[in-house]
C-alpha cells in the first residue's frame, strides 16, 4: 500500500547561509550605517539572535532575515519569534528559535484533520512525523494538498513516498 511521511525539518546549512547573507546585507544598508546590529546563529539551540539599538531596527533585521531565508528556499514560518524583546543596556534583541519536527498536539491536529476529510487513508503518529497510508495514490495526493492548505503555522515536507 502506498504511504508517505509528513515531516517538518529545516536544513541548518541553508539557515547558516541565509544568516551570513543577511549579515552581509547589514554592511551595505544605509539605514544600518554606524549602528551596532548583528545576527548570531546558535546551531546547538537551533536559534537565531538579532541585536540592534532600537525595537524598530530589530523588526527590520527580522524582515531581512525572512527575505534571505525565502531566497534560500526556507519558509519564514520556521522562525518561532517571541512577542517581547529582551532589553539590556542600550541594545534590544530577539532570539528566534527554529521549529524542527512535529510536536504531539500538532500531530494530533493533523491526524484529526485527515480523518475529518473522509478520505480512505490511515494516519498514525510516529515520533516527530506522521505516516499516512492509503490504497490510492490520488487519496495520498489529496492529503498532501489538505495539509499544505491547512493553516497550521508550520511548513511541512513530504518524504519517504512508497508505492
From Swiss-Prot:
Assigned keywords, A-Z: Nucleotide-binding
CDD domains: YajQ_like
Superkingdom: Bacteria
Entry keyword Protein biosynthesis: no
Entry-linked InterPro entries: DUF520, UPF0234-like_C, UPF0234_N, YajQ-like_sf
Pfam family, one: DUF520
GO molecular function: nucleotide binding
GO CC field: cytosol
Entry-linked Gene3D superfamilies: 3.30.70.860, YajQ-like, domain 2
HAMAP family on file: YajQ
Its job: Nucleotide-binding protein.
Family statement drawn from the similarity comment of this UniProt entry: Belongs to the YajQ family.
Name listed for the protein in its UniProt record: Nucleotide-binding protein PMI0103
Amino acid at each position: 500500500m502506498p504511504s508517505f511521511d509528513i515531516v517538518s525539518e529545516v536544513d541548518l546549512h541553508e539557515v547558516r547561509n541565509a544568516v551570513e547573507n543577511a549579515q552581509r546585507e547589514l554592511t551595505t544598508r544605509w539605514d544600518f550605517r554606524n549602528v551596532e546590529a548583528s545576527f548570531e546563529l546558535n546551531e546547538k539551540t537551533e536559534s537565531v539572535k538579532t541585536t540592534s539599538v532600537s525595537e524598530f531596527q530589530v523588526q527590520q533585521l527580522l524582515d531581512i532575515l525572512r527575505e534571505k531565508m525565502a531566497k534560500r528556499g526556507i519558509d519564514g514560518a520556521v522562525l518561532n519569534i517571541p512577542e517581547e524583546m529582551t532589553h539590556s543596556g542600550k541594545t534590544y534583541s530577539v532570539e528566534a528559535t527554529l521549529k524542527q519536527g512535529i510536536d504531539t498536539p500538532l500531530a494530533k491536529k493533523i491526524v484529526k484533520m485527515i480523518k475529518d476529510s473522509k478520505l480512505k487513508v490511515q494516519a498514525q503518529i510516529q515520533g516527530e512525523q506522521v505516516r499516512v497510508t492509503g490504497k490510492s495514490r490520488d487519496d495520498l495526493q489529496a492529503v498532501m494538498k489538505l495539509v499544505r492548505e491547512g493553516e497550521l503555522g508550520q511548513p511541512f515536507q513530504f518524504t519517504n513516498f512508497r508505492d
